[in-house]
Regions:
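Exported/extracytosolic protein signature
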Residues: 1-179
């Protein structure tokens, strides 16, 4: 006899591949059960970033477009979360998990993030997403009308600050007054 079992499939995506420090990333997991006439029982989702420096927030779980977040047991830490949905997934069902990640500090190298979907009666399936977190780069230019000033003379300076990395924004920057 051939043993039939349900099979989960998870796909993971983020809205961008490169984020700035301080920026929010928007992530979505898409989970289905692909075997005809089968049901995955008690679906569980684990999602973890391999490095620290971000904060996961605003987790929302839907089953067939219906918000089931309040029905789920969610254990969220800064760079990972576990969701026990308590729900089953049949062949025509779609479960989605949407969440936000605030990249709080510069992280060296690429940041791999792995999501795993499992249930009481299936093998686990996983998908990965890799992003890069770059700091903004500031260029500071100072100019004045005169090359030198006499003691007691007032001088007017213009300071121009520009951010050099494409599609990035510097937040809350300050610079010392150096003359």
């Amino acid at each position: 006899p051939i043993l039939k079992a349900p099979k989960l499939q998870i796909t993971k995506q983020s809205d961008k591949k490169v984020y700035a420090v301080g920026e929010t990333g928007y992530y979505k997991l898409h989970i289905t059960q692909g075997k005809e006439g089968m049901t995955a029982q008690n679906v569980k989702v684990v999602d973890e970033f391999e490095k620290e420096g971000m904060k996961v927030q605003k987790i929302e779980v839907k089953l067939n477009e219906k918000d089931i977040t309040s029905d789920c047991k969610i254990d969220a830490k800064d760079h990972q979360f576990t969701i026990e949905t308590g729900k089953d997934l049949g062949e025509n069902d779609v479960m989605t998990v949407a969440y936000q990640v605030v990249f709080e500090k510069r992280i060296e190298g690429a940041v791999k993030n792995t999501a795993v979907a499992g249930s009481d009666n299936t093998e686990d399936d996983q998908d990965e997403n890799t992003v890069v977190v770059k700091p903004p780069v500031l260029k500071i230019e100072k100019s004045t009308a005169h090359k030198s000033y006499k003691e007691g003379q007032s001088g007017e300076y213009k300071i121009r600050v520009t951010q050099r990395n494409e599609n990035m924004t510097a937040h809350h920057y300050s610079f010392p007054q150096c003359f």
